[in-house]
């Protein structure tokens, strides 16, 4: 339930990734977010400057009283140094510089997890079978600039988000071909985590490794171009890279579902998978998700959903702000 203290509006909410910073405003109790804008992180020296640029663009906006930002980084203590960007800031100093009475900063995938109970039927697409069980744990995984992992567990009348860095678990091969590719990645990285393959940079690394093993000359392609060529079936190396990506993601998502007992469903977010459409539906994702030997039938009962909502993490940031303010007022 949104807290209704009128003196805390307008509220600023943000979703800060390694590539883009997305902002919106909630004008009054119970109203949906409005004034959506997406800014490029590289265009701004830091988060303060990005927020100031957003507020300047929204000329008719009264100064926000409180704010909540989901950020692609662990949040421990006051100092935040982003993993996939060079921004660094003090939460308290940022609050003062923005003139806010309250500033909540949380991990972006924690924010995304908090949004899941608020998703409407048309804001998710099921992949494969299974039926969600109300009140059971929910898992969340999402490749983007990095690999985000989170979840929800029942707590009282609502859910509590799980905060961790599951994208950095060790990546395991399930096929001889994957073992070859991981060996190539191991020559580049001290630790081949899941994120080293299951992210935008990871898709590029897989494509590079496939070309290297084929004896083909290097070809610098961005992740979006690799995906586009794969879906158009215009490049066999791109097609294999994306197929391997989807299969590995299924395996890692299955591990997560087993760890949490995620009968509330496994949700796939991030900036890559929602753009893949039917390619992802036809990929090895679901087969590999269920392919866990003695526990294959267990996983077959767990549904998987691709998140289709345009700005879900902003809804989660709004929920985190509601919870923080409700805790302060005892409501």
Swiss-Prot record:
Keywords: ATP-binding, Cytoplasm, Glycolysis, Kinase, Nucleotide-binding, Transferase. GO terms for cellular component: cytosol. One of its GO terms (molecular function) is glucokinase activity. This is Glucokinase. GO terms for biological process: glycolytic process. Its EC number is 2.7.1.2. It comes from Aromatoleum aromaticum (strain DSM 19018 / LMG 30748 / EbN1). The gene is glk. ATP binds at residues 14-19. It is found in: Cytoplasm. PANTHER family: GLUCOKINASE. It catalyses: D-glucose + ATP = D-glucose 6-phosphate + ADP + H(+). Belongs to the bacterial glucokinase family.
């Amino acid at each position: 339930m949104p807290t209704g203290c009128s003196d805390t509006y307008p509220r600023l909410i943000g979703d800060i990734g390694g590539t883009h910073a997305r902002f919106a405003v909630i004008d009054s109790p119970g109203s949906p977010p409005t004034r959506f804008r997406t800014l490029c992180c590289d265009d701004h020296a830091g988060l303060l400057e990005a927020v100031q640029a957003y507020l300047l663009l929204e000329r008719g906006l009264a100064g926000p009283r409180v704010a909540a930002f989901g950020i692609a980084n662990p949040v421990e203590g006051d100092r935040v140094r982003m993993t996939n960007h060079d921004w660094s800031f003090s939460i308290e100093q940022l609050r003062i510089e923005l003139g806010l009475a309250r500033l909540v900063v949380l991990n972006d995938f924690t924010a995304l997890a908090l949004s899941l109970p608020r998703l409407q039927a048309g804001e998710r697409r099921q992949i494969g079978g299974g039926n969600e069980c109300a009140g059971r744990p929910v898992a969340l995984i999402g490749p983007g600039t990095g690999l985000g992992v989170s979840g929800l567990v029942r707590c009282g009348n609502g859910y509590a988000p799980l905060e961790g860095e599951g994208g950095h678990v060790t990546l395991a091969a399930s096929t001889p071909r994957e073992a070859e590719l991981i060996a190539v990645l191991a020559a580049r990285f001290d630790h081949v985590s899941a994120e080293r393959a299951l992210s935008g940079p990871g898709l590029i690394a897989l494509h590079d490794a496939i070309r290297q093993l084929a004896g083909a000359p290097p070809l610098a392609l961005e992740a979006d171009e690799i995906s586009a060529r794969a879906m158009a079936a215009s490049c066999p190396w791109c097609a294999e890279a994306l197929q391997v990506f989807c299969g590995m993601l299924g395996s890692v998502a299955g591990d997560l579902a087993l760890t949490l007992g995620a009968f509330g469903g496994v949700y796939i977010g991030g900036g890559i998978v929602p753009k893949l459409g039917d390619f992802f539906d036809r990929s090895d994702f679901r087969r590999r998700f269920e392919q866990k030997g003695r526990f294959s039938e267990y996983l077959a009962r767990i549904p998987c959903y691709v998140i289709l909502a345009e700005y879900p993490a902003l809804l989660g940031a709004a929920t985190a702000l509601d919870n923080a303010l409700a805790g302060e007022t005892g409501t």
